Amino acid sequence: MKERTVLPIAVVGLSLLWIGTLGLWALDAQQADPVAVDGSKAVSTEQIKWKLVTTWPKGLPGLGSAPENFARRVEEMSNGRLSIRVYGAGEVVPPFEVFDAVSQGVAEMGHGASYYWKGKIPSSVFYTAVPFGMTAQEMNGWLHYGGGLELWRELYAPFGVRPFAGGSTGVQMAGWFNRELKSAEDLKGLKMRIPGLAGEVFTASGGTSVRLAGGEIYTSMQTGVIDAVEWVGPYNDRTLGLMEVAEYYYYPGWHEPGAMLEFTVNQEAFDRLPADLQAIVEGAARATNQDMLDEFTARNNSSLTSLLDEYETKLRPLPDDVMDILHSNAVIALDKLKEDDPMAAKISASYEDFLDGVRTYHEISERAYLNARDRVLPPISFTDQ
């Protein structure tokens, strides 16, 4: 009888061992790859907190509100799994150190303008604005469907930074001046806050370019440190009170026809995110990019009316010879940049090729329509001019 019980006991023992092993495997699998009730892959509930530093004063409409809107979108879309705290210029790092802060991991994200890093990355100017270059609509087309974004990421990759388009103001104003410009001669000796490639162009045209952050502009104009300033357009310029420190407001924005801002993300921090949160960051950036252009398009109108009617700002077009000398020097500056920097030559080839193509189509679409509209609608005039 005892011999008959050996096999069943052995079988039971092996079965229990096998069941226990399967249970451990299942537990390990569940811990490594959670599964929802319906059998789909469960979403991690880990809460991640990021810092986002900016080059703008806290609460500045348009530029400053864009990163706040981005952070809100990310938190809502991720159901609170990714929370981003936004810091204004100087709260964590000075405005012109935002790129380095993201590169070094001091903050996971930044928001600013790429031409602020011109001293470190000369080719970065292409991703804010090129004088007499693309509009916001054209820039977005080049970035997202013309290869521009891929080149941008190649440019920032050595610094461990991943860029996204972060909003556009549309065509800007040429700037505020404390004296009237009647000809190109009036540029001589003029000190102007104007960054990027346009700063080089302005200096070559007889003026002196000065690099200032947004929070320093008003006082610098008020105290005579500078004679002129370009910032954005009526919406933001009115907020900064620039109509109080300068009499003349010039157009068009030859230097920033479609100023593009940027979100920068520390690449290692981005790589650590689950795939769905990566997609949320990218999607929120894309939405914020378009939203800023919408906001400036809507708000500039009433702000310009206020500047003209309430503050009696003197609105002026730049004289033709001023535009001519600025364009001539812009060509020279761009050619020199391409000669000195192989990456600039590579990016410029893509940029110029896209611009040539889009200009051809816009000649019979955008421009043709605007001409047709002007022909049938009442003319627009400014009483001050």
PLM region descriptions:
Residues 2-134, 138, 157, 163-385:
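N-terminal secretory/targeting leader peptides
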